[in-house]
Each structure stands twice: as structure tokens, then as C-alpha cells.
Amino acid sequence: EDYYVANKLMKGFIGSANIDTNSRLCMSSAVAGYKRAFGEDVVPCDYTDLECTSLLVLTGSNTAWAHPVLFQRIQRAKLRNPDMKVVVIDPRETETCTIADLHLPLKAGSDVALFNGLLQFAHNNGAIDEAAIGEFTQGLNDAITSANTIDAKDVASLCGLNEADLNTFYDWFINADTAVTFYSMGVNQSSAGVDKANAIINCHLALDFIGKPGCGPFSITGQPNAMGGREVGGLANMLAAHCDIENPEHRENVKAFWQSPAMPECGGLKAVDLFSAMDAGQIKFVWIMGTNPVVSMPY
């Protein structure tokens, strides 16, 4: 695909990492969250999981408008499985709420408190098999200790939610057979976007809602091909197949596969840094493909 060829040309043959994709401004929080949790930018579920889950959580996403085809798929899944519960977490009552069994209109920016509260609730109600989860994860006790710094009433107050509705959501989540959480720009586009993503991922890891059908923390992209750009290594600090440009072994493997004469040893300028470098006269030539930053990013 075009991203792959452009990235190969720039990094493997021109020898510069000054290339960045729309994934940067769209999905960088999700990328960092996945890398912090799993060691690489990997989405541990796919769209078929929504069709066999017992609980679907939509947070930071007006799916009906932003992902209409996906929303239609959710509607069909709900029609086929009326017992599937849908929770929409959004400060606004959007069209997506028409499919919700429960809408939580939390205060903007309080997502970390909400999901840390869920982790605390799960722990306090004995829903976490700590011995089993501890075999395959690191830091579970630290995460629980951090989550236990506030109680349920404080969470409800911080999030601006009715305590009964909050407890209903928590109860549904810890008692579900399977759970999928879709999160998008309402989570990612934030000064605490990475922490929000990891708070969600932590709940899935702690309750074993990952790595099996109908389960997983799923960051749905906010722009076309924002996932594809990541997979082919189009980000300034990445190489193809989620390889890290600053990892010598990764560099050599990709360089050998490409049979390329050059390979930068460190990440290049990221999108906003590229604009600043252009303004300072440090970048003499720019090739813009498939986007119009003067309109979409008038920095």
C-alpha cells in the first residue's frame, strides 16, 4: 500500500525518518497505551468479537456518526442477541445512546477515575483471580493499590454520575461472561489520553477479558487508515510490522528484508515538529500525500 512504499523509500533509501502519518495526531495515545501494556502497538481483538460479546462498552465515541458502518454492525449484533448489554460513556447524549441499555454522562476528562473505580470494584468484590492473572501480567498489585485511593462515592462525585448507575455499570462488567470496550477520539484526544487507554486495558487484563472470543480493549481509529499507517511503520519512530526504529535488531531485520542501502538509527521529526522545522527553515522540501494540513491542521 502507499504508506508502506513511501515509508520504505524515505527510511530505507533516502535514509531519513522525517516521515509521519495521520496516525500521529489521531492515534498516538492509543499506540502509547498499547505499547505500555503489551510492549507493542497491537490490538488484541477484532470486529467479530462484538458479535459474540455479552457486554459492549462504547466510550469516547459517537459511533453512530463517526463509524456508521460499525454502528450498523452493532445494531445487527444487538438484534441477533437481545441479551447483549450496551453501555455508552459520553458527556453528551448522542445518537449512539439510542442503542444503549445504560448511558453514563460522565464529566469530561474523568475517564481514568471511572475505570480505576471499576478496577477497585472488581477487586473489592472478589472478581479478580489475582494468582492466575499475576502469572501472565506484571504490576497488578500496584494497579489495585493505586485504584484503591478513592472509594465508589468519590468516583461518582468526580465523574458527576449517579452512584446507582455507576454501580450498575460496574456490576454488569464484573459479572459479564465476555466484554469488549470500544474507545476512540474522546479518549485519545486528551492530555491524559495514554493513562485513559491504560485504565481501560487494565480492567480487561485484570478480569481476563482479553485473548478470547468476545473480549478485548479495542481502540477504534478516528481517521481512515490510521491503523494501516501504524502497521506499515509510517510513524516517525517506527518501522514496518511494528518494529522499533531505535532497536538495532529491528533495524537490521527490516534493512535486510528491504535490501536497502540506508537506515536511520533514531526517530525522525513527528508531525507537529515537522511543521515547526518548516517554519524555522530547517526543512527545505516537503511531500504531502492525501491530506491538506493547511485546512485540517492550521498550526
Q: What do the PLM-derived regions correspond to, one by one?
A:
Residues E1-N225, E249-Y299:
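Cofactor-pocket helix-loop regions in the catalytic cores of large enzyme subunits
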Residues G233-I245:
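Acidic, Ser/Thr-rich peripheral helices and adjacent loops at domain boundaries
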Residues M227-R230:
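Extracellular/periplasmic loop regions
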